[in-house]
Amino acid sequence: MGILSNSMADQDTEQVAIQFYWDVGSTNSYFAFHLLRPIAEEFGAAIEYIPFNLGYVFRHHKYVLSEEPKAKLKNRATDLKRWAKKYSLPFNVPEQFPIKTSDALKGSLVMRRFGLEEAYIEKLFSTYWEDNDASIASLDGLLPLAAELGVTETDFIELLRSKEISEQLIDLTQVALSNDIFGAPTMVIEGEIYWGKDRFDFIRDHLLDLSK
């Protein structure tokens, strides 16, 4: 599951795991998804993708994005465009925001069964945050993504609607809360939490220390 790299760390050491808590409805998860993978590859670390219901976590903490200072929200789009330009990412602010993401998140757990989790997540992020396509909020919008990766509509729907997959997403969200995960993206290395898309220098330092 995730990246399994052999680059910098071809040593007789146990592979480091990076837990990546994400929600496709999180703008910063989009950036973190693209920025984390090269670092993981460089250090031979494995990324463990952990979907969780960010909206539920926000409600648990009584946080409402729209209630942030208007000046901050006004600057948000400009700041995101700066990030996209800096890292040469084809990011676009979607017209429809926020969206429901529970089916999309459950879909990643379905695709994990087929060894296609990371490829599916990449399609989710590109569809919504690059193509301005909010159809991923519905099952009908997810089916073409699964089909492009070779999973039949029947298999995808059957698993997505299963009690097991639904309970798995609920459990992962509860695990996130119990582990003090309060937002997305959150990366965890050896129990140490790194929150946000601007923490990769610290993540690199952590991995560098482990490689010594």
Feature names for model-found ranges:
Residues 1-11:
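Eukaryotic N-terminal low-complexity, Ser/Thr- and Lys/Arg-rich leader segments
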